[in-house]
Design a protein with these regions (language model features):
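Amphipathic alpha-helical segments
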Residues: 1-31, 35, 159-201
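Non-catalytic DNA-recognition/assembly elements of restriction-modification systems
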Residues: 16-77, 185-195
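DNA target-recognition domains and sequence-specific DNA-contacting regions of bacterial/archaeal
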Residues: 42-163
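Short hydrophobic/aromatic patches at helix-to-coil boundaries
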Residues: 203-206
Length: 206
């Protein structure tokens, strides 16, 4: 398919719009749940946490090869690079990584290592759906201006709304998953266009 000059530009607003729409839907649904159920469950009842010490990467220079283990941070960068260290890799399944100082968090469903001890690794207790808690934490827009650890003293005691029926939670999480998949498809399409553009430009004057 021929590329028009504006193909990539058209994709970027679409992705931004999808993300904004996802956030709006999430906030609407969680506000409705909170209004109906009230603040009825503590984070400490829902999540276990693990210190990341054993999963901290030894090397400070990372690789670009995606075949190796990603090194993660909870901030916007998320994947800092990759390591070929074959030991002490977190591979216990889905978790939330939360920066104890900035309160940034990410939902992770692949094996990884981390950069620093500032991370808390959070996993669900019993039949709690982790995706729901992750979305709720983002819904709260957690922010801090204090350089200290927050999770144990402030986040764990926090009350949030959690439906009595897991069916309602599953419906909410499924909705979030559908938006994620749509955004992922559009992102892949954008990357494909960029690769095609770069290829054409590199061969234009050969």
């Amino acid at each position: 398919m021929p590329l028009s000059a504006n193909s990539n530009l058209l994709q970027i607003p679409l992705i931004k719009d999808l993300v904004s729409f996802l956030v709006a839907i999430r906030d609407r649904e969680l506000n409705s749940i909170r209004k109906h159920y009230g603040l009825n469950m503590q984070i400490s009842e829902m999540l276990d946490y693990e210190q990341p010490s054993k999963y901290i990467v030894s090397e400070t220079e990372y690789l670009n090869n995606k075949e190796f283990t990603p090194v993660l941070t909870a901030n916007k960068a998320f994947i800092l690079g990759y390591t070929d260290e074959p030991f002490n890799i977190y591979d216990k399944g889905e978790c939330i990584i939360l920066d104890d100082f900035t309160l940034d968090c990410k939902l992770v469903n692949f094996a990884f290592k981390v950069k620093s001890s500032a991370i808390k690794i959070l996993t669900p207790k019993n039949d709690i759906l982790l995706r729901y808690v992750y979305e709720y934490l983002n819904f709260l827009n957690l922010e801090t201006t204090e350089h200290k650890r927050h999770y144990i003293s402030e986040i764990e005691p926090m009350l949030i709304a959690y439906p009595d029926s897991n069916e309602n939670v599953i419906t909410f999480c499924d909705l979030m998953d559908k938006f994620d998949k749509k955004i992922e498809i559009e992102n892949k399409y954008l990357q494909s266009l960029l690769s095609q553009k770069n290829y054409l430009l590199s061969n234009m004057f050969i």
